[in-house]
Amino acid sequence: MGTGTRAAVDSAFTCETFCNLLKSGLDVKTAASAVNCAMLMKSTDESLATVDLFIADPINSTIEVYKCGAAPSFILRGGKASVLEAESAPMGILDKVDMARSEIHVSKGDIYLTVSDGITGESWGWISAELKTYRAENPTDLAKHILRCACDRMLGKRADDMTVIALMVE
């Protein structure tokens, strides 16, 4: 969320700190609260970052998705796309962080697609339409296709970061 050096610094700080806290053994809620507090305290200027966290459990064939101000994600299963969307503020805005959590059962061949708000722009309906019609051989091809479509929609007016991540369940 945001552009330029400041947004890059806030994003890197959030990602690195969150990952380190999770690796040290903190649960997601506690780590999110700590990162949010750090974001609030680190600057007198507005400092914020969106979070889109994905935790896979291969034993139970589930994924947990946590979102904090992030753009929608999508599950592509058997040619049908489901949308994972959550209403929550980015980290660094409110005193209390409220990460939306979803748990999804996944099967072999399912593709999980997550994008930044620079990809969705003002709406994400076009992504659902693309997922219904585009037949990707692999997740990399799908991610590249969505990125190309987003660039075409922006008509050269790139205003935000444009990130697409696609993962396939094997």
Indicate residue ranges for each PLM-predicted region.
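Active-site-proximal, acidic helix/loop segment immediately C-terminal to a metal-coordinating Asp/Glu
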Residues: 2-25, 85, 95, 106, ...
